[in-house]
Amino acid sequence: MVHRGRTLKSDTDVTSLNASTVSHQSKPFRQFSTRSRAKSNASFKGLRRVLTHDGTLDNDYFNKHNVSQKCKSSDALFRKRTISGLNMTALTRVKSNQGKRSASFHSPVHNTLLSPKNSSHSNTGTAGFGLKPRRSKSTQSVLSLRDAQESKKSESTTDEEVECFSEDNIEDGKVNNDKVIAEHVMPEEKKNVQQLNQNELQSPDSIDEQEEDKSGTDGKENHRAVSLPLPHLSSNNYFGESSHSIEHQKDGETSPSSIETKLNATSVINEEGQSKVTKEADIDDLSSHSQNLRASLVKAGDNISEAPYDKEKKILDVGNTLAAHKSNQKPSHSDEQFDQEDHIDAPRSNSSRKSDSSFMSLRRQSSKQHKLLNEEEDLIKPDDISSAGTKDIEGHSLLENYAPNMILSQSTGVERRFENSSSIQNSLGNEIHDSGEHMASGDTFNELDDGKLRKSKKNGGRSQLGQNIPNSQSTFPTIANIGSKDNNVPQHNFSTSISSLTNNLRRAAPESFHGSRMNNIFHKKGNQNLLLRSNDLNKNSAAPASPLSNEHITSSTNSGSDANRQSNSGAKFNSFAQFLKSDGIDAESRTQRKLWLQRENSIMDLSSQNDGSDSIFMAGNIDAKREFERISHEYSNVKRFYNPLDEALLRVQPIITGNANNIRKKSHNDAQSIAHSSSDTDHKDEDDLLFTNYDKKFDDLYPHLASAKIQAVLSGIWKSESYLFNKDVNPINKNRTTSTNHSVGHTASQNARNLLRGPMGSSTTLHHQRVINSLQPTTRAVNRRMENVGYMHTQPQQR
């Protein structure tokens, strides 16, 4: 047994081992030791000596040396360099195991790279594991993993696992495949029993991924390998050394339980030269030898509880029976292609109990469910049930005749049932259901047990819809029961055509809450909805029955007497404009109210009088409206500077008046001085004070008088310009004199206003023009619409 950090060879063994290989004599002897227990991913201590020129084993190696002797570390390092190129090529997939496992798991090099610790392996006497060339049909390996065997006398089994191999026949020799099974004994395997309980029904297809995931994480377990045996393993010594495989079994048991764990999916196609008698003899030798070894292991102090393994054995037996049943029904395709490629064999891994069953009793959860679904679908679809693609006597597809009586909302989960029997008959009912057979097939759907249907819906989570096919009544309970057990069973019975979906969505159950509520909402607006229903009924009376018309008929019949009373009131709505105003004819709509709010910021009319000369500028004229908006903007800009100018004039006015008063005072004083040479200073001062107060009061009133004069001038200009504008635009007023009376001027202004809209003075424009004295505001959009209407009325008269 190889122990870490030290070698147990003597000097004579080392010299004899060096002398057996010529290619290694030139390499200097180097022996190193370390006591570090760190896991190494590049340990090659267990590799056998090979000859690199022809890829065959050194046969003298087994003769000169005992199998239990250990190879030194320098040879392992040399072999590492020798097989480095082969290790690179071993990381690819082979055709025989596409989608199953990588070929790198078959190589001994990869196994040693994956090994967390350098545990020993049982060794075979005559055969090894490795690359088997297909061309020469050689039974020898290019590479073989030398397993440093633990002798039966050794008592240290705590750090090392025990591995052995067995080869048996499965189920009375029906399949003659050589099996190599690795059973492992380690204390850490107790924690794997719970994991086996969870994965006991999995298929052997998914154990590859489980081994790949666990190979990099479990530090206490040995390297991983896929057990692929060699064709000829008939040595009694081989089976004698491989007796560790059933040390967990009881004394009265033999190896058939372990034989059941082997499946055809992971076995290699054997060569036909194997004899059945030799195998049975080997099995007997194996069973007797395993009991002796089991007793020796228990004496060695390897305290391993047998209860978990007994429980695990039962679990594996259940999985083995399922897998064996599967292998008998479906032959493995990987075995047929296996010998087409060169592959690398490796011994069994020492990882866990899950790998003991060798990808046979465990499988992925998803694949298990998929296989179970396939088996259940086989039960669901017997031979007497016609498929979805079958057609009846007349050549119509059976799915076209099917209309379900329920709908399941995928977003809310609400189920809506359509109890009306007429909803099942679609537009093809009159043509297809002529014979009694088709009607009977339709009646079988209606006569199904609703209790079973609801129970299956609650358990399965989706509605189970029956097919409109023969014998659907006898097969539907099976579908419902399976759907209640497994909610992942895909049901493709629901018709996915656009017409059927539309019909199903439009069908509302009067008994359901949602359907009754929607019917009440529709019948509240009886004016417009009853009009549509009455029109549809009149149109569909002569036409053939369609799903849409049937729904209108059923909905109208379910509406009640209130809807029938209101049917006469809806007859007066014969135009689309009145239909829009069905809620209230005189009431303003929301859009109209928004327009009124928008018009509040628009410019109001100038005055409420229409008999003046300026009536042309009222809101009825679009051009006048635009001109007024332009002038109003200019006037508002001028008005901004009114207050600053007024204040500036008020500041300047006292200065001007003060200078005038001073001049007048000087002239007055000169006259007084000439007339009165005497001194009258007191009286002059009083007069000056009196005039100054009067001047100030006059100056205060002067700006208001000036503004009044300005307003009078502006109003005169406005009136004169309005009269000139009215005279220039109206061609009739050119021949008239200005001495006309007030009535003539009023009629002229009316004609001028009409001519702005229509050049020929048509009276039709007056009808479409707004009332001038109304104070309702307008917008440009309203005025343009009115102008366009008047323009369209005047166009035929111009032609």
UniProtKB/Swiss-Prot annotation:
Membrane found in the keyword field: yes
One GO CC annotation: plasma membrane
Disruption phenotype: Abnormal activation of TORC1 signaling. Abnormal punctate localization of TOR1. Sensitive to high hydrostatic pressure (mechanical stress).
InterPro entries, alphabetized: TORC1_cplx_su_TCO89
GO BP, sorted A to Z: fungal-type cell wall organization; glycerol metabolic process; regulation of cell cycle; regulation of cell growth; response to nutrient; response to salt stress; TOR signaling
Tagged with keyword Membrane: yes
Compositional bias of kind Polar residues: 97-126, 233-243, 254-269, 420-429, 461-476
Bias-annotated ranges (Low complexity): 348-363
Stretches for region Disordered: 18-41, 97-171, 201-284, 324-391, 418-476, 538-568, 663-685
Function, as annotated: Component of TORC1, which regulates multiple cellular processes to control cell growth in response to environmental signals. Nutrient limitation and environmental stress signals cause inactivation of TORC1. Active TORC1 positively controls ribosome biogenesis via control of rRNA, ribosomal protein and tRNA gene expression, and rRNA processing. TORC1 positively controls protein biosynthesis by regulation of mRNA stability, translation initiation factor activity, and high-affinity amino acid permeases that serve to provide amino acids for use by the translation machinery.
Record's miscellaneous remark: Present with 243 molecules/cell in log phase SD medium.
The protein's assembly and partners: The target of rapamycin complex 1 (TORC1) is composed of at least KOG1, LST8, TCO89 and either TOR1 (TORC1-A) or TOR2 (TORC1-B). Interacts with PIB2; following activation of PIB2 by glutamine or cysteine. TORC1 binds to and is inhibited by FKBP-rapamycin.
Protein name, UniProt field: Target of rapamycin complex 1 subunit TCO89
Protein source organism: Saccharomyces cerevisiae (strain ATCC 204508 / S288c) (Baker's yeast)
